[in-house]
Amino acid sequence: MIIYLISLLPIIVATLMLYQRWWRSNIPPGPKPKFLLGNLHQMKPLWTHSFSEWSETYGPIISVWIGSQLTVVVSSSDLARQVLRDKDHQLSNRHRIARMTQTGTDLVWSDYSPHYVKLRKLCTLELFSLKSIENFRSLREMEARSMVVSILKDLMSNSGDDQERKPVIVRKYLAAVVLNTISRLMIGKEFGSEEGKEFKAIVEKEHLLSGSGTILDHVWWLKWVSSWFFSDKEFLAHKDRRTKWFRGAIMVEEDIEIEDHRGFVRKLLVLKEQKELSEETVGGLVWNMLTAGADTTAVVIEWAMAEMIKCPTVQEKAQQELDSVVGSERLMTESDIPILPYLQCVVKEALRLHPSTPLMLPHKASETVWVGGYKVPKGATVYVNVQAIGRDPANWINPYEFRPERFLQEETDVKGRDFRVLPFGSGRRMCPAAQLSMNLMTLVMGNLLHCFSWSSPVPGERIDMSENPGLLCNMRTPLQALALPRAAARAIPLPLD
């Protein structure tokens, strides 16, 4: 028997080699991988930059081996259309890392399935329909006003006897206004200061752990010796910390009577009581909304403000429009957005040049398909390089120039219909909160420009426009700027503490 099995071994090995050769045949070109590591040793911390450089060599569709996982990256609008529209059904699953993605029971990381459709429909009806967005409009406007008041109060407290103007950290106010808006939308209240600080600390730790586990999650044989590189105890402690925060800040809502419908979480808890959703799904869905909604919106606004400090003529043009349309006796509201075309273009230009997720979240092929004349095997990961497409000279004149006027010359949809600019994705996996995000970004940015003039703390000093590695495209150095109150801000009565 043993001799018989040994005699079959060469046949088995040859069969496996032939299958592997067939499986790899006709896949897109790309850098030559190394045994076991694939191309991981060649990857820069900013993956999108590596993919863009390889695309210049091998073409707009490439194969990259992330450890043992085949990854196909597309970097042109035409190929993005094929992935997100023409082959959307076959490429709507998610490639996910088990430790960091809620095991696929949430909305963001679940495969395309009846479960996903159910969660998306629930979120759309309760949070992201036009009716829901309009119902919560006053909430967003109140938070924008609170942001302006907070900046004014800090400017007053920061000015010493010499009346020297001190810079403000823009991210501080963006993080607060967006998180407060999302939390009130989700649970009907703002987080307390300690809850907010703990939430931010947990998110930062999660990004750090995700980065430290990258190689382990893609190279199967390293998992055998994972204790050399990564502490599972550290991750488990982080998971417990996140669960504790979630139960304290969110699930305490279970103590409220079911009839008290305050926020989206109340609806989820009703479904949990009815056994339609598990606690894990509720937790994952709420975490999706809090982290994705808060982080992605604030990131884009910070980049836009940095660009307008670099290019003051854009800032002045947006302010002139606001002064003409809104005046100086009141703050801008969401009802003003349709009659502020240049401000809308500023937001679109920021989304084009600085999408919050430069690599669209990874898709996974549920069956073998052909894209751009190449085979994408079943099980392959597929990335759309959104940043590269938004900066493609084939699509845009002077693509690295921040020039909102380009959107005045041509009506461009940024919510999934125009494949030259895809900040929210497209197709079945498109971000369901695209319209809400656009409204909030435009409102916050409009109030920042209407109420303050922004400039560099040191005249002539270059702003650090480098990017921080990670899933989100944060500015590596938080933006600091001088804020000079304008007429609209001076019309706001400050509350007495």
Swiss-Prot record:
Residues bound to heme: C431
Enzyme class: oxidoreductase
Keywords: Heme, Iron, Membrane, Metal-binding, Monooxygenase, Oxidoreductase, Transmembrane, Transmembrane helix
Domain of life: Eukaryota
Disrupted-gene phenotype: Drastic reduction in flower buds of the content in N1,N5,N10-tri-(hydroxyferuloyl)-spermidine and N1,N5-di(hydroxyferuloyl)-N10-sinapoyl-spermidine.
Record InterPro entries: Cyt_P450, Cyt_P450_CS, Cyt_P450_E_grp-I, Cyt_P450_sf
GO CC terms of this entry: membrane
TM spans (from-to): 2-19
Xref: Pfam families: p450
Tissue specificity remark: Strongly expressed in inflorescence tips, young flower buds, seeds, stamen, tapetum and pollen.
Cellular compartments annotated: Membrane
Cofactor(s) essential for the protein: heme
CDD domains: CYP98
Thylakoid found in the keyword field: no
Keyword Oxidoreductase appears in the UniProt entry: yes
Any one GO biological process: spermidine metabolic process
GO molecular function: dicoumaroyl monocaffeoyl spermidine meta-hydroxylase activity; diferuloyl mono-(hydroxyferuloyl) spermidine meta-hydroxylase activity; heme binding; iron ion binding; monocoumaroyl dicaffeoyl spermidine meta-hydroxylase activity; monoferuloyl di-(hydroxyferuloyl) spermidine meta-hydroxylase activity; tri-(feruloyl or hydroxyferuloyl) spermidine meta-hydroxylase activity; tricoumaroylspermidine meta-hydroxylase activity
The protein's Enzyme Commission number: 1.14.-.-
SUPFAM superfamilies per record: Cytochrome P450
Membrane topology reported for the UniProt record: Single-pass membrane protein
Homology family: Belongs to the cytochrome P450 family.
Function: Acts redundantly with CYP98A9 as tricoumaroylspermidine meta-hydroxylase. Also catalyzes the meta-hydroxylation of the three triferuloylspermidine phenolic rings. Unable to use 5-O-(4-coumaroyl) D-quinate or 5-O-(4-coumaroyl) shikimate as substrates.
Name this polypeptide is given: Cytochrome P450 98A8
Gene name, Swiss-Prot/TrEMBL: CYP98A8
